Amino acid sequence: MDTSEGIYFVRHNNRAVLATIRRDGSPQQSPVTVGLVDEAIVMSTRETAYKVRNLRRDPRAWLCVVTDGWYGQWVQLSCTTEVVSLPDAMDGLVAYYRALSGEHPDWGDYRRAMVEDQRCLVRFTVLAAGPDVAG
């Protein structure tokens, strides 16, 4: 599967399991919501999350993206990542929200919540994609 096909799959499927690498080399997995902003895969998370600590140490990551129904087609994406912290992350966090949910009723409130929750943005660069499997 071409990487562009894997990225296209995310346009219509936002549920994923993210795998990062712990300090001891074992996998750490988290259910996440990914979105597509300017043809790049992104997600929002907390600065204090283990996945962020892992990605800052080792930027390799794997996403298993699934449909909303869970069973059916899925795609695995091998990636490198960039963690963007506030305040630099704010525009990306707004774009992420818009990509998934449209307009927010109070953008000021949203921005305050991002600061209070210590949110950051993770950008994924897809290196390989596949297989596209139904199961």
Name each model-derived stretch.
Residues 68-70:
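AMP-binding (ANL) adenylation modules
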Residues 8-11, 56-57, 115:
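Alpha-helix boundary recognition
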Residues 1-16:
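Short, basic/aromatic recognition patches
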Residues 73-135:
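Charged, gly/pro-rich active-site loop segments
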Residues 14-47, 53, 61-65, 74-76:
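Short beta-strand segments
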Residues 3-4, 48-49, 107-108:
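Structural motif corresponding to alpha-helix initiation and N-cap regions
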Residues 14-15, 60, 105, 129:
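Generic structural signal for secondary-structure transition and capping sites
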